């Protein structure tokens, strides 16, 4: 089973307000691995959609991640959760692609009083962690 820790217990309504469905960082990584290796139905199209340009919480504003680093991601935001997961394709100095999955999930038990402050603050946390991960991988894999 691809995502054994995922629980879909309610349909997602028209405006996306659902709070009881659950997944785990491990399941998001499993999804990314299967997607990268073309093991999901329509993997190529899913990767294309996830790579469409837009602001993300993984690379946008992360000072160590070079501009132009390919990112395929999906963000999610509610008054209880701010998240982003995806595949970043870094490059080594020799030009080799170095793909890696990253998942950032910040959850709050009670509804945030200021949605804007909640999302922007937690987005910065996810971005900071993504930047730290890139710096660690840069040293290990001789990334640009």
Residue ranges and their predicted role:
Residues 1-38:
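Mid-domain, small-residue-enriched loop/turn segments at the edges of structured enzyme/sensor domains
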């Amino acid at each position: 089973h691809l995502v054994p820790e995922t629980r879909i217990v309610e349909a997602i309504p028209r405006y996306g307000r659902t709070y009881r469905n659950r997944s785990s960082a491990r399941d998001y990584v499993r999804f990314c691995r299967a997607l990268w290796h073309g093991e999901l139905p329509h993997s190529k199209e899913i990767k294309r959609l996830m790579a469409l340009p837009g602001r993300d919480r993984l690379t946008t504003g992360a000072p160590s991640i070079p501009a132009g680093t390919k990112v395929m991601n999906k963000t999610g935001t509610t008054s209880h959760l701010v998240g982003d997961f995806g595949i970043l394709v870094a490059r080594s100095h020799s030009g080799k692609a170095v793909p890696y999955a990253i998942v950032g999930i910040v959850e709050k038990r009670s509804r945030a009083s200021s949605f804007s402050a909640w999302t922007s603050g937690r987005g910065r946390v996810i971005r900071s962690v993504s930047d730290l991960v890139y710096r660690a991988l840069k040293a290990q894999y001789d990334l640009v």
